[in-house]
């Protein structure tokens, strides 16, 4: 079960310390993790990037694929088995959530898990006087920037949808000599992309969309990387 999430405060968490780790036990069973557009290039060097559709809202979210099956993360191990770690994983155990008394106001919350929290080793969150430490301020600033970038990512995805570039596809793969299918994923249609008028390409260049688009397309090659990781686990 997910660890409980509580608003971060000096009263409840004044003695808490964060023990930095590249173990990332909280994503051991995560097959996919969401991405922001700013990390497409780094992610594409090691992981496939696809889009998943929310069946209730119809909205698309870019994600990194970490495994071939539900509950499988091939990058999970004693140490993370990739040079790049998606930002949403790195921000753990912190997150921003709407405040209960004011849903329009975001508040910093912490996932109370034994994996990274303790009272003796690591980075303190508060001083003896109950003030935020420099470490906590840095984590808050990074998370705030990430939150801002989620809106830029939504704008990027909305543009792709507006131009009808995202299409559902079934990928036929071969892993360990066995044929597999990945269903329910969506990709940018390269033929539709190349058929766009010049003014659309100029607009994408102006907005900085071309780089993440091509990073996504190139990331399809990383299914071979996933297959190699799968071979090592069987």
Residue ranges, per PLM feature:
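Short, extreme N-terminal leader segments that mark the start of a protein/domain
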Residues: 1-65
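Aromatic- and glycine-enriched beta-alpha-beta binding-site module
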Residues: 61-125
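Short acidic/polar mixed-charge low-complexity motifs
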Residues: 56-59, 70-71, 178
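Short, basic/low-complexity N-terminal boundary segments at the transition from targeting/disordered tails
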Residues: 25-28, 66-78, 149-155
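A short, compositionally biased
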Residues: 43-46, 90-91, 165-168
């Amino acid at each position: 079960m997910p660890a409980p999430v509580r608003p971060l405060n000096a009263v409840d968490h004044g003695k808490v310390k964060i023990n930095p780790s590249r173990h990332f036990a909280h994503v051991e069973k995560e097959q996919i993790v969401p991405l922001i557009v700013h990390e497409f290039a780094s992610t594409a060097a090691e992981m496939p990037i696809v889009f998943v559709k929310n069946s209730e809202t119809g909205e698309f979210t870019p994600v990194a694929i970490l495994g071939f099956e539900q509950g499988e993360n091939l990058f999970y191990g004693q140490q993370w088995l990739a040079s790049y770690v998606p930002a949403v994983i790195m921000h753990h155990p912190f997150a921003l959530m709407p405040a209960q008394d004011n849903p329009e106001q975001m508040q910093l919350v912490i996932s109370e898990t034994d994996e990274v929290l303790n009272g003796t080793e690591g980075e303190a969150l508060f001083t003896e006087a109950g003030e935020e430490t420099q470490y906590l301020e840095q984590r808050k600033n990074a998370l705030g920037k990430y939150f801002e970038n989620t809106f830029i990512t939504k704008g990027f995805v909305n543009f792709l949808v507006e131009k009808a570039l995202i299409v559902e596809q079934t990928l036929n793969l071969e892993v360990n000599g066995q044929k597999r299918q990945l269903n329910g994923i969506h990709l940018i249609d390269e033929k539709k992309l190349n058929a766009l008028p010049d003014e659309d390409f100029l607009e994408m260049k102006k907005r900085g969309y071309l780089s993440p688009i091509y990073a996504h397309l190139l990331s399809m090659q990383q299914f071979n990387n996933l297959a190699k990781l799968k071979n090592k686990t069987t």
